[in-house]
């Protein structure tokens, strides 16, 4: 009998999950029913207390993984709709606002179609079209040629190309694609040499770091991008191109640094590599459509602010063009990572609940955030994010930390100037999440690379910790510098 069927029949795995879920439920109910004075927040309403309980539920479910991370996000939206919205049960609404400000149910459900979600969908559709047409293979072949045959240069080429692809294409898809390209290369390398380890490690490192380069590179970026640009919140007007302007140089620097570290720890014994990238490129009009649309979309993302077109609107371009030209079919839509989309939506809903019910405002007024040391907040938030993201989804980590830190930053006000302002803290979370890559479970690219059997967990931990902590330190230093020079705000 297959092992997975045995696990299901035995119930051992599910019993553990059930116990964790039950504990989470009990703690949530406890927080839900605590006396309001317990929280120490002046003016706290019943509705706001419910939001705190829902937030506690989200934290525990994401940390324990009692249910899948995307299911937690759906649960958040479900509980918000039924318990704190204007469409919840009447006995939960009270009469004439006696329980506090209720959320607009339409606004909660709109989190599934938030403009930033559309931005992500545009990125997913671009990736599907590039893979389907073979454009990704063509680009990889073209981009790797200048690096020649010298082993060290080939390694540099792969880590840079992986990083660049990960800015616009899912880092999971990028890692899978690039490792496929390396399969014939491994056959030519000594079985007991360190070159195989070096090349294999280059892929997840490149994919994880490269994701920092654009707002769509990884979900934590999208969270920070959304909060910083929210018209009802910080409204800083940071464009897609501005994000790339200060993050891409950081990414390139970290990729080159990672290349140097990998070479030092896992040097090649074979000095040259014969590289043959395998894959089909379809030479037809649809490939031309994909290529033109791909580059026009990227150009509009970069320069759209000057033309009056924002990044979210631009994301509809590839979706529409590929739909009416038949490049993307209904079946292709199944390839979109809907779990990630729903996870992001759940995080947005949490932020909406904290702001829409007035909880964030009351917390800012009642808790003396202004007395906190900005540097301590920056360091602790970064290290907590880095640590958590090594063990749980970095999307879940960002969804937990960014709403809290947004409130903290609003309460600290001008005192954050010493570290470059609120963007340093929030974008710093995105950086910390991307730098967390010490274990096979840390990120999907890590898991894919580990599954090849060419690297051991100790190899991944060694490179992941060194590159991750250096990336964290350098990334924060850069954010502080550009923040103090007012280069981030739109």
Label each PLM-derived region with a short phrase.
Residues 60-68, 161-170, 204-216, 300-306, ...:
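Transmembrane alpha-helix interface/packing and boundary motifs in multi-pass membrane proteins
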Residues 22-26, 52, 56-59, 78, ...:
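Generic alpha-helical transmembrane segments of integral inner-membrane proteins
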Residues 42-52, 113-122, 171-175, 248-254, ...:
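Structural signature of hydrophobic alpha-helical transmembrane segments
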Residues 42-45, 57-75, 81, 85, ...:
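Flexible hinge motifs at transmembrane-helix junctions and intramembrane kinks/re-entrant loops
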Residues 18, 22, 51-52, 74, ...:
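Hydrophobic alpha-helical transmembrane segments
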Residues 2-39, 126, 132-135, 191-224, ...:
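Juxtamembrane and boundary regions of transmembrane helices in multi-pass small-molecule transporters
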Residues 172-186, 200, 213-231, 319, ...:
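Re-entrant/interfacial helical elements at transmembrane boundaries that shape
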Residues 8, 71, 75-193, 339-340, ...:
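Membrane-embedded alpha-helical segments and adjacent helix-loop junctions characteristic
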């Amino acid at each position: 009998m297959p092992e997975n069927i045995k696990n299901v029949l035995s119930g051992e795995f599910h019993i553990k999950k059930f116990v964790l879920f039950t504990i989470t439920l009990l703690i949530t109910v406890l927080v839900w029913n605590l006396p309001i004075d317990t929280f120490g927040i002046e003016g706290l309403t019943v509705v706001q207390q419910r939001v705190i309980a829902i937030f506690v539920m989200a934290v525990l479910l994401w940390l324990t993984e009692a249910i899948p991370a995307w299911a937690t996000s759906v649960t958040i939206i479900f509980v918000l709709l039924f318990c704190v919205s204007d469409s919840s049960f009447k006995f939960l609404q009270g009469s004439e606002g006696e329980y506090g400000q209720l959320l607009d149910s339409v606004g909660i459900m709109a989190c599934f179609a938030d403009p930033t979600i559309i931005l992500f969908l545009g990125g997913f559709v671009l990736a599907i079209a590039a893979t389907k047409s073979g454009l990704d293979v063509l680009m990889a072949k073209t981009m790797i040629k200048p690096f020649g045959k010298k082993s060290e240069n080939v390694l540099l080429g792969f880590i840079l190309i992986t990083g660049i692809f990960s800015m616009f294409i899912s880092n999971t898809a990028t890692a899978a694609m690039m490792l496929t390209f390396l399969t014939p290369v491994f056959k030519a390398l000594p079985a007991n040499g360190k070159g195989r380890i070096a090349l294999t490690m280059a892929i997840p490192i490149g994919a994880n770091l490269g994701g920092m380069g654009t707002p769509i590179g990884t979900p934590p970026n999208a969270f920070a991008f959304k909060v910083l640009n929210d018209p009802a919140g910080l409204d800083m007007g940071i464009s897609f191109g501005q994000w790339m302007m200060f993050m891409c140089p950081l990414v390139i620097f970290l990729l080159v640094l990672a290349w140097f570290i990998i070479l030092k720890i896992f040097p090649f014994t074979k000095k040259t590599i014969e590289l043959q990238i395998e894959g089909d490129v379809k030479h037809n009009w649809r490939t031309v459509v994909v290529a033109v649309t791909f580059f026009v979309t990227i150009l509009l993302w970069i320069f759209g602010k000057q033309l009056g077109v924002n990044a979210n609107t631009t994301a509809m371009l590839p979706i529409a063009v590929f739909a009416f030209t038949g490049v993307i079919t209904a079946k292709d839509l199944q390839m979109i990572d809907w779990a990630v989309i729903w996870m992001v939506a759940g995080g947005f809903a949490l932020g909406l609940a904290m702001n829409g019910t007035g909880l964030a405002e009351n917390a800012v007024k009642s808790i003396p955030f202004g007395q906190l040391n900005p540097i301590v907040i920056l360091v602790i938030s970064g290290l907590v994010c880095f640590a958590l993201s090594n063990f749980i989804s970095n999307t879940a980590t960002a969804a937990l930390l960014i709403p809290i830190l947004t409130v903290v930053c609003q309460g600290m006000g001008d005192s954050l100037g010493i570290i470059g302002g609120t963007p340093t803290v929030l974008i710093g979370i995105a950086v910390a999440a991307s730098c967390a890559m010490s274990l096979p479970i840390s990120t999907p690219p890590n898991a894919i690379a580990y599954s090849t059997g060419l690297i051991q967990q100790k190899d991944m931990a060694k490179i992941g910790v060194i590159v991750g902590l250096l990336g964290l330190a350098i990334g924060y230093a850069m954010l502080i510098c550009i923040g103090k020079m007012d280069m981030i705000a739109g």
